[in-house]
Amino acid sequence: NVPVVAKYRRSSTSTSTEHTIYRIKEYAHGLQMDDMVALPEYCTRLDVEPLQKLPVAAVRDIPALPPMSEWVNLRDLGAKGDDMTDDTKAIQDAIDQYDVIYVPQGWYKVSKTLRMRSTTKLIGFHPFGTQFRLAESTPAFSGFGAPEALLESSVGGTNILNGIGINTGAYNYRAVGVKWMAGQASYMNDVKFVGGHGGMNKPQARSSANQQTPGQNVGARQQTPRISSPTNPVAAQGMDLAWDNQYWSLWVTNNGGGTFKDIWTASTYASHGLYVNNTRTPSRIYAMSLEHHVRAEARFKNVENWKILCFQTEEESREGTQCQPIEMEGCRNILFANLYMFRVIRINEPY
């Protein structure tokens, strides 16, 4: 019973309806034109459909976070988040004991795969200030072989990953940032996959071995090659051999899915920002930015029943001249809306 549809403060007037239960089919208030040659005029248009009973509430794609009374603080359970202490055991022990874990701001060093239970929720509030990180050449993620995830979801669970950055470094050749196999009701939100030549940290000072040679332009593309890392990348075109040497940053597989919102996956060290394969679970992407890869920003293989909204790819001139924005194979029932694919103006070759 809401008879007043809208109330206008400036005019102290309102738009109302006589119906007790109704659906608004059209509402417009302000300067309007009936067609391209009509004179504009201020008016209010309201079209309501009376109903006999309230409709069934729509199912939300975006779940609410658990109440804070259920949260446990990861620091209180022994994790340091100082980017020096190996926090793997403290984090895994917390996951094994508790469902909802608050991860305070800090950089948490990890040396083995973290595995979520079916009910695990990991909650941070800043995907750069709060990171799970690999040190360079971490043994469990190095050498040759099958992909090894820094963080692995449960299979078919209701996992949540919120507000946490994932950093697999530059020289961890088997690394995957997140392997996601959780179910339709799972949720990943506000996650940054760290790496490449973009970042928010203060650049490290150059060592004497990395100083410019006589006649070399400071800051130019012809700078001396350096050992790369996400905190101090080689920015010159073609000079960073660490690019494109890892597996995918975000891997959705094994019938995994859910809702993915506000994801920034731009690690140049990964082969793809997103790889989805072998899943028919109905899933949604809301606002994902994929940038700065060498071979492809996103790849879909044997995927069905996905809605991909506000998907943005970007190829950079330094590493992305040969990069494809999206590769698809064996896919069905995939919806793209508000898709935005672009290459920076500095790229001098077409797709």
Residue ranges and their predicted role:
Residues 1, 122-125, 160-161, 186-189, ...:
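All-beta strand scaffolds that present successive hydrophobic residues in beta-strands
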Residues 1-100, 127-162, 166-170, 174-177, ...:
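Extracellular "leader-to-stem" segments immediately downstream of a signal peptide or signal-anchor
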Residues 91-95, 106-118, 122, 151, ...:
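Short, T/G/N/S-enriched strand-turn elements that build extracellular solenoid repeat scaffolds
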Residues 102-104, 121-123, 133, 284, ...:
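Beta-strand cores of modular interaction/reader domains in eukaryotic scaffold and signaling proteins
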Residues 130, 296, 306:
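Glycine-centered loop/turn positions within well-structured domains
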Residues 169-171, 280, 285-291:
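Short linear interaction motifs
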Residues 246, 270, 294:
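Beta-rich catalytic cores
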Residues 262, 267-273, 287:
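Surface-exposed beta-loop-beta
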